[in-house]
């Protein structure tokens, strides 16, 4: 695979090869990714710390490597040599994967995780690929959505109780769950507590993806409602980038 990248009068070329017998979809995508990255860095003059990786879960690669019998060094080598991740970031990934595998050992047959989605946000960020809509445009759909969600939570809770499954983690994501008003959040958390047996739940997270949707009252509602963790996602610490997206 050969890539050519042009920008501001500069041109970068890069090629990567694999034996024909190894040219399956995964390996073909890999050399395309590598050749584009190497050509682009020649033109841009910068080296991203996450190398050629894209997406939101870089630890999938290191965790998969270790699950298949690779060592921590093997996982770091994969990230650094194949995807050009910096040593600092590869160590971060491998460390996260190590803790992931340790946490997985706590799971027992019949354990599961529950995700509750709130597909609404104050506004929609330009880069977002999640199923979500802004309250400004679709706020009228929020009350009926919550009514349906309450019914589904009650039904799912009964289903889990009858089948003998146990919730080990519960995550309320979105969208931006903290788009809900404090009364709406309180009612939703009450429905969760009434319907689910959380006695074996190790972590109950409410995602507060937009800090501007949080205040003291809502934080108290989340705490009193049984959540043990909140996830605040600044996306970036650069104010100009935040304003742009």
Stretches found by the model and what they are:
Residues 2-3, 116, 230-232:
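Short beta-strand motif preference
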Residues 132-245:
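Conserved non-cysteine loop/helix-boundary elements of the Radical SAM core domain that shape
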Residues 1-20:
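Amphipathic beta-strand/beta-sheet edge segments enriched in Tyr/Trp
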Residues 44-47, 67-114, 163:
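N-terminal [4Fe-4S]-dependent radical SAM core
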Residues 117-132:
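Local cysteine-cluster metal-coordination motifs and their immediate loop/turn environment
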Residues 16-28, 32, 36-37:
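Extended acidic/polar, glycine-enriched regions
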